[in-house]
Every structure is written in structure tokens, then in C-alpha cells.
Amino acid sequence: MKMSKMFMPTLKEIPADAEITSHQLMVRSGMIKKMTSGVYNQLPMGLRVFKKIEQIIREELNKKDCQEILCAALLPSELWKESGRWTAMGEEMFRLKDRTEREYCLGPTHEEAFTDIIRQEITSYKQLPLNLYQIQVKYRDERRPRFGVMRTKTFTMKDAYSFDVDDKGLDKSYQDMFDAYVSIFDRCGLENSPVQADSGAIGGSTSAEFMVKSEVGEDEVVFCSGCDYAANVERAESCNLASQKEEMKELEEVHTPGAATIKELEEFLKTSPDKFAKTLVYEADGKTVVVVVRGDREVNEIKVSNAIGSVIEFALATDDVVRKVTNAEVGFAGPIGINADYVFIDKEIVEQRNIVVGANKTEYHIKNANYGRDFEGIVGDFRNVQEGDKCIVCGKPLEIARGVEVGHIFKLGTKYSESMNANFIDKDGKSKPIVMGCYGIGVERTAAAIIEQHNDEKGIIWPLSVAPYHVVIVPANMKNEEQISIAENIYNDLQAMGVEVLLDDRDERIGVKFNDSELIGIPMRITVGKNINEGKVEFKLRHKEDKEIIDIEEINEKVKAEFIRNNVRLG
């Protein structure tokens, strides 16, 4: 491609609304153009990158015998009502009606659509296993679009769905997709970590996220310093404290005027917060929920809502509800005698002795409370992991980092097949629900994550596998016919080899050309300048500072060597 004919609106200045590096560089390099909040047009340079990521995805999934289809983006509400997600998806779903008042949505995801296809066609175990995928635009009415293509209202996703006869088959499908994802992200040049994750509104028993460590990541990820344990903070667990052996003391009610928070109580009683139990009151679809954690801990609301199951609305209770549940003002709730639909007790509380709890009485607390003797509830892990907690696998300290999710895989089980009657006849002639998995990758988000990992002060440093073009040829002087002629010969030779080449034939200063090539991140640059008098050109790799002067005859082999080094096919 000759740059004089290319639509590539680059910018020198950083856009005012671009908060993170990938957003800034995507806009500045002419990859994307904002249409409105959360909606971006993809320009030629960006589209080439996105299509290359899609092609890598296709190649790796096809190796696993997955088959590509394309579902409609406009989906009838009936399918979502069957699965129970028409309401559960909440305000993120774009809903609309046609002229006959029939309800539809713009697909935010496609579990229902794929299940509908399969239930109409699959009747026997002989037709399974099966794995279908698509690369399709999704629509989600994000409350706060941000970070460029990281969080938008429309985005491209590869979503795949596996269909098996039993859990053993699902385990194999899940592992195949896990392995495919590792290969996909490796080929994209992404350093990533698979981590245990919460399944969220999609549902299912097991899921893993593929996370890219990044300071601008919206997710917190827990990593062990001593083993391979890694989990999203929503799912992460840590070891409990060792059981305390001291004898249980008698309950003692204490007047604590003005001490309605842990900090105030800590100062009033001169006791550390790990000696307190913090009792929080929530509402879940009209039910009252009480959660008790140690005073220096935070409640993990995802774990609590998962313990309840199928929760649509989950939030801290209003002051009026707290007063009704505790018969006291806010700040004095405790687990002893509390009146709630659910009472959840974090496992750490069970191991503690003689803790301080709210008395459910305004301006009073109770000392020496003990689980089992004084209060009970549903015991489980309902707290957030903190930096330095001990790993549940090896006992070493845990670390917390921010990350960007680029892929997510789920074991759905029979969640959708049961609700939508997607059944098959097994070897014994019995009807059984198909066992499913689903697997997603965000295409534009993957590109943004690559930029977050591969950039410098000059611009993007694309890995060769996903670069919009492999080589840029820069004639130093557009008034020098010999330079132009040699540049065009190199351009034609490399194209004939299957190399994707940019020829910067613009009538611009060489500094402008260099700046643009570095901004857009082309992996290799060949400069045709004064050295042609000696039959030589300048060769430079984007990720290195040094330059080489090489013979023109060496160019083809030099470029080939980079493809081999990066394990990228030519042509």
C-alpha cells in the first residue's frame, strides 16, 4: 500500500478524553475514530489489526475442530425469557420492539441463540460432541463507557459454544479451548495469566479468565508468590487464621456511645479491628441478607449473591431496612438474635474466640461473642482476599495486581439446555440435557491489551503477527528519482514474497515519515537514502534503537529471518 493513497488520520496531540495509553495511541495512529460515547468507527489501520487477531483465533479454533457460523444480532425476547435472562441481564441489554410490538434485543451474548439452533438439530448422542463459534458484534448499554475500546457499547467478540453428552466430555472440550486460548494469546504477543473467575450472569460451575497484567486494568487479580494459584478477586480465597484456643468468656454488653464504625469502635475499646465482627445488611430481590466478616475485612458481594443463587438485584440495605432488621440505628448491627432471611458467616469468624459484635441496640456492643454458642448462620468464604493473605494451595503470601480480561471460558453444564429443552437420546435410549460450555474473546480489547504491553514514548510496537503492515519503506528524498525507483523495486519484491508493505511515497520531510512509522508501530523499516550510491539501505526494527546498513541484496533474507524469529508465516 502506498501511503499517499492511504486514509490514515494521525494526530500529534493526545486526545483530551483518552485516559490510557492504548486509547491514546489507537486514536493518534488513526486506528479508530469516536462516533459517540462508547461507539467507535474502525479505520483501515485498525481494521487490519482486528482482522489479523480474528484470523489467529480462527486458525487455532479450527485446529480443535471448531466450526464457524454466524448468528443474527437481532434476537427475539422469547429465547431470553426461556432461559430466565430477559430480566436478569438488567439495563445493559438493548431492548426494542418491531412495528407489531414484538420484543427483541440486540445480542449482548449468544448462549440462547446457539442453544436454540442445537435443540432443533441435535437429537442423538451420535451427533455429539460439537463446538461452534462465531465472530460477531455484541451490544451492551454500558453505564460508563471508558478507556477507548476496552469498555464500549458495541464490540466484536468471538464466542464459542461446546455441546457434549456428559461432564467428562465437557472437561475435554473445556481443556481444548483452554489450550487454544493459550496459543491464541501467545501468537498475539500477549503475556497473560489464566485465573479462576466468577461466572456472573452467564452462569455455570467453573470459569477462567485470561488476564493481562496492566495498571489500567478494571479487574483486580490475586496471584500467589509461591505457586501457580491465580484468581479474580471476585473468586479468590485465602487461608483462614489458625483456630483460637482460648476459653469462651461470658457475654458482656458494653455501652459504646458514638462508636458506630469499626474505626470509632477501635478507638473506644482500644482493641484492634481483627477482634471485631463487622455485620452488614443487604437486600437481595426483596429478601434481607446479613453478612458477618472480621472487622478488618471487606464483604465479597459476588460470593454472597452466588451463595443465595439467581439474584437479580443485590445491594446494601437502606437505613430503614437496617433499623427493621436490627431494632437499632445504623452502626450497631450484630449476629446475635438478628432477624433476617439469610445470615452468612465468614469462615474466619468461626475460628475466632471472644469477639466484639454489635448488640442490635443503639449505642451498644457485645464483647466475648462466639460462633456456635451465641449465633449461627450459613458458613462460607464471603470476604475479599487482601495482599499478604496466605495462599490456600501452598501457604505463601498472595499478591494483588490489576489486569485486563481478554478472554473468558465457562463450564455451563446444563443451565441453558435444561431451561430451553435442548436434549438428546443417549446410548440407552434415555433423554438427557446436552452439557454445554461457552468461550469468549474480545477482539478490540485484545488489540488494546497488546498496545498496553507493547509501546514506548514514540508509539505502538506491534508484534509481527498482528501488525497492520510488516514493513515500511521510506525514501529519504522524494525528489531523488533513483531513491524512488529503488524503493519501488524493494516494495514490489517484498510484496511478491507475501510481505505486507507500506511505501511512504508522501512528499513529507523524512522526520515526519519516521514519526508516523513509529507511531503506528510497523515492525520493520527500510530507509532508502544516500547509501544507495554504495548499494546499501538502512534497516531498523521498531523494538530496537540500533540501525543496520545492509546491502540491497540482503533485504529479502533479512525480512524472512524476522518472520522465522517471530514464528509468523509468510504470505
Curated annotation (Swiss-Prot):
> Which GO BP terms apply?
prolyl-tRNA aminoacylation
Which reaction is recorded as catalysed by this protein? tRNA(Pro) + L-proline + ATP = L-prolyl-tRNA(Pro) + AMP + diphosphate
Q: Where in the cell is it found?
A: Cytoplasm
EC category name: ligase
Sorted keywords for this record are: Aminoacyl-tRNA synthetase, ATP-binding, Cytoplasm, Ligase, Nucleotide-binding, Protein biosynthesis
Cellular component terms per the entry's GO annotation: cytosol
Q: What does this protein do?
A: Catalyzes the attachment of proline to tRNA(Pro) in a two-step reaction: proline is first activated by ATP to form Pro-AMP and then transferred to the acceptor end of tRNA(Pro). As ProRS can inadvertently accommodate and process non-cognate amino acids such as alanine and cysteine, to avoid such errors it has two additional distinct editing activities against alanine. One activity is designated as 'pretransfer' editing and involves the tRNA(Pro)-independent hydrolysis of activated Ala-AMP.
Q: Which family does it belong to?
A: Belongs to the class-II aminoacyl-tRNA synthetase family. ProS type 1 subfamily.
Q: What is this protein called?
A: Proline--tRNA ligase 1
